[in-house]
Amino acid sequence: MPAVASHAPIAGTIGPNAVLRLREALDADCGQDATEALFVAAGQLPLHRAPLTDMIDERAVARLHAALRSRHGLEIATRVARRAGDLTADYLLAHRIPAVARWTLPLLPSGAAARVLVRAMLAHAWTFAGSGRVAVHWATAVRRQPGEAAAIRLELVIEDCPLCRGADVDGMACEYYAATFQRLFRRLVAPTAEVREVSCIAAGGDGCRFAVSW
């Protein structure tokens, strides 16, 4: 049976990092004028320079990511989204994850550390998945094929993912999530951890699935 996240206390909202770090990443990659133009195109200009401390309507976040893809193309959108994910993870590590967890998890066996991290992610899934549903499927057997550097240990799934709901993309559209998850796993579980989105609802998948390996 997969582990499933608890329901969001405020349905349909996402934490402000999804916008704050996107702004920061786009400023660095394309410049502040391009960032402002993106927010205008997405109809989200009020979010452009606001301090943003409250939860944000997930539809606003989705429109920003859609505008990023449409205005800049998938290659640049992927690069910016991954940078925003890295910045989000860095913020969480610095301000949201208790110091004792930051110190002790890397000292645990990777499997044990992963289970602690995943439990915390499921408990707080409402902050990043909004009205989507998050589940984890653990690998029943870990086998590393000849020539492979890592083995898939688990799969994180966001069903009805709000970030790309209704999108039609020739590729993966949730690199923001993939980068955030990867940074957290590398810092807290295994330095070699990799997180790849292997299925996306924007590309016709039944869910946004992230394979976690190390």
Where do the model's predicted regions map?
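Residue-level signal for beta-strand positions within conserved beta-sheet cores that form or flank
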Residues: 152, 191, 206
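Beta-rich nucleic-acid/ligand-interaction surfaces
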Residues: 195-214
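Active-site helix/loop of acyl-thioester processing domains in fatty-acid/polyketide metabolism
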Residues: 175-190
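Amphipathic interaction/junction segments at domain boundaries or subunit interfaces
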Residues: 53-176, 199
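N-terminal leader/assembly segments
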Residues: 1-91
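Generic structural motif
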Residues: 132-136, 193-195, 213
